[in-house]
Amino acid sequence: MDFCDLIETMTQAIVRGDGDGAAACFADGGIYHDVFYGAFPKAEIPRMVSDYFHRDAERFRWDIHDPVGNAEVGYARYVFSYDAKIAGSEGKRAVFEGVAVCRLKEGLITSYTEVANTSTGLQLLGFSTERLARIVGRQIDELTARDEVAKHLGP
């Protein structure tokens, strides 16, 4: 399956609540790194879909735009939205945009990560300034811990 079909298959399986279908897009040893919920190995992706995504939200929409890839890596811009079920945000619509980065092997995903503009969606959910600051703080910690970022932080 080419990357365009693979990313559509994976995202739409998650939208439907089909965790097994999403996991089938991953190679053995593959990991889904979610910007909110953390890292889930292939065997845990069905639980991520049911116990996190569909526990906390409903009426998902995940549109993929401009996917490009080769045998080793794929990138796809996306717009993702849902109605929240979490306390204090029930029924509010969150909208996010981002870029999915997929490492690939033999037509399957070995690593799914994303660079996402999360503050817009969380603001739409009514998150407090303090809560947003904690989330941004975690994102700063994750970014600055990466080896490739070290040379950007100082001599």
What are these regions, as identified by a protein language model?
Residues 43, 72, 90-96:
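A generic structural micro-feature
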